[in-house]
């Protein structure tokens, strides 16, 4: 990202979940959002749009999360969902090699439509509890994440060893922290002057004893 991307205060975050059909995107989101539908076998046909409020450093933010369809025929539609995305979660199934290979196709689509340098990537390998069925080596997934400069998490939508919720919350908090660290200094000075002026007005408006 360049400095021109940090000229306004961050109030909301658009996050998109991408991945092949059946990798568990919806189940992961339902667990994170506390939705009771974990065992739903149906695939996402269009998209699901969720919203969640989070607090960081005493400030409130709105996170908009888009759960996208994973079927191959919908891949050209995904460009609509990734517009203005700040965080992209790439989800694959540790027991399905094709779902891991499909990430290259998704990254190609992403590169064709948005600037990769303007988003934070997150890689989630799902169904990590099915060790005897793994078709992807953990070291290969980690290497892929390193190439993307992405955060990496091994998850089971039903029994994560590490809290999935803490991981996803941490992703959003890290993005907010990164954004705020890069805010335009002129904006910070203007806000500081405005806040000082407001305090002076309140002080001057107090009745004299």
Regions found by a protein language model. Give the residues of each.
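Conserved Walker B
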Residues: 69, 94-95, 128
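Generic structural signal for well-ordered alpha-helices
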Residues: 104-108
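Post-Walker A helix-loop "phosphate-sensing" segment adjacent to the P-loop in P-loop NTPases
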Residues: 34-42
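Short acidic active-site motifs
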Residues: 73-77, 99, 140, 163
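Switch II (G3) loop of P-loop NTPases
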Residues: 61-75
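Conserved P-loop small GTPase signature centered on TRAFAC-class small GTPases
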Residues: 1-26, 30-34, 53-60, 114-209
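Inter-motif core of Ras-like GTPase G domains
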Residues: 75-97, 103, 113
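Residue-level signature of catalytic and energy-coupling elements of molecular machines
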Residues: 28, 67, 89, 103, ...
């Amino acid at each position: 990202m360049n400095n021109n991307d940090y000229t306004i205060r961050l109030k909301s975050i658009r996050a998109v979940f991408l991945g092949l059909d059946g990798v568990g995107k919806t189940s992961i989101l339902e667990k994170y959002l506390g939705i009771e539908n974990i065992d739903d076998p149906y695939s996402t046909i269009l998209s699901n749009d969720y919203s969640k409020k989070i607090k960081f450093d005493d400030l409130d933010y709105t996170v908009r999360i888009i759960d996208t369809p994973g079927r191959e025929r919908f891949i050209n539609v995904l460009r609509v969902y990734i517009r203005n995305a700040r965080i992209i979660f790439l989800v694959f199934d540790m027991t399905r090699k094709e779902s891991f290979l499909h990430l290259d196709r998704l990254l190609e689509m992403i590169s064709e439509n948005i600037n990769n340098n303007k988003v934070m990537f997150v890689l989630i390998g799902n169904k990590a509890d099915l060790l005897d069925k793994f078709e992807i080596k953990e070291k290969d997934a980690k290497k892929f994440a390193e190439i993307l400069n992405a955060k990496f998490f091994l998850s089971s939508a039903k029994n994560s060893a590490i809290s999935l919720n803490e991981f996803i919350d941490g992703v959003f908090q890290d993005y907010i922290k990164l954004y705020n660290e890069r805010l335009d200094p002129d904006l910070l000075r203007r806000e500081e002057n405005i806040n000082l002026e407001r305090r002076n007005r309140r002080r001057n408006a107090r009745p004299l004893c």
